[in-house]
Amino acid sequence: MSNVPAELKYSKEHEWLRKEADGTYTVGITEHAQELLGDMVFVDLPEVGATVSAGDDCSVAESVKAASDIYAPVSGEIVAVNDALSDSPELVNSEPYAGGWIFKIKASDESELESLLDATAYEALLEDE
């Protein structure tokens, strides 16, 4: 079973979301998602300053197996991207919940967080797959 940190929120598309001290949210893909994709070769990062809606595809993770869209779990403005992934996309594999984060977003509607899954619900989703 994949590692599913309890403090994070999750989307049904296998993104995770962590609230930061400054009020922004860090987004990445889950350990389960990176296991399905395999070794990352490239991550197409969103543009800082871009405004996205929940469910918009805003990034692409390319692995040796496939390319997969990464969706915004909440609406808002992209305020930072993980530039380290340009040179080291494998961080998504080795540190999916730490150094392999993909972007940070300033949420425009925090009520959208209610539609995300907690760790228990995400684990149940994985068991059903």
Curated annotation (Swiss-Prot):
Keywords: Lipoyl. The modification N6-lipoyllysine is found at K65. Binds 1 lipoyl cofactor covalently. InterPro entries: 2-oxoA_DH_lipoyl-BS (IPR003016), Biotin_lipoyl (IPR000089), GCV_H (IPR002930), GCV_H/Fam206 (IPR033753), GCV_H_sub (IPR017453), Single_hybrid_motif (IPR011053). One of its GO terms (cellular component) is cytosol. Belongs to the GcvH family. The glycine cleavage system is composed of four proteins: P, T, L and H. NCBIfam families: gcvH, PRK01202.1. HAMAP family: GcvH (MF_00272). This is Glycine cleavage system H protein. The gene is gcvH.
